[in-house]
Amino acid sequence: YLIAHSRDVCLTRKKDLYFPKRFCEGLAMISHQNAAIIDTISAIPRQTILDCETPLIQLHALSSHLDIDLWMKRDDVAGPSFGGNKARQLEYYFGAACDKQADTILITGAIQSNFVRLAAACAVRFGMKAIVQLEERVAKSDPTYQQSGNVLLNHLLGADILYYPEGEDENGADDTLYAEAEKLRAQGRTPYVIPLSESKPPLGALGYIRGAAEITSQTTDPFDYVITGSGSGATHLGLAAGMKIYCPSARVIGSCVRRPKAAQASRLRHLTGSFNTLIGCPDFLSEDDIHLWDDALA
């Protein structure tokens, strides 16, 4: 079988069409429902962050060792400031922020979050101030962990840094950002919050519908499986929807990175409803489309 894998997301492939580059031909070859979904997504504000398609490469040595045809989608090189797969998600969050004429973005994540660091870099690109909230998710971390890596880059990118002590309290972390946003509004600023908790629609998941279209445009044979990390759930849901549109024979499997399979399944069930509403098709993704694996969770 065929598998494609990236640092944060693993994917599988099948041939179909990529929008917007092949938008017209794609509409001619997919169902009316799928075409309506693409039409809905195309009307949602988006800011370009990826300058080009990311590579899809075959892993010859691993393929031979495992006796499979294994590929990797290199979304680790997507976007500015050392890249990362969250660039696809941020295209839609910054699309919404620019549409609202925001001058400040607020985001929360782990202390060494790539998502947070990439958001800070994108804020510079779009002329916005970044306020990043770093959550204490690692017990007894040393000063190097607290100050180096992405934390240092956040400082260099000019972000204001806040700290939140409860690393697994997503609703509380979001509430703190919304309270900070209200303070900014009182000062005449226009903030935009990029939320983390499952209580908000996963807007960033739309980026991986486009990502699935890109994958299928780069290959001539269909993949059987797509394997992705499943944490917040946005990348996982976007790929599940995108492959259902462009490569319905492929099974998307989420490898749990933060919580056991049962807890992650509950989270994704909750997010699926708001995601389906977002794409204008209330019954598009169902529990049958969500597959999880947690054997490597530690």
Regions found by a protein language model. Give the residues of each.
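PLP-dependent amino-acid enzyme catalytic core
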Residues: 25-298
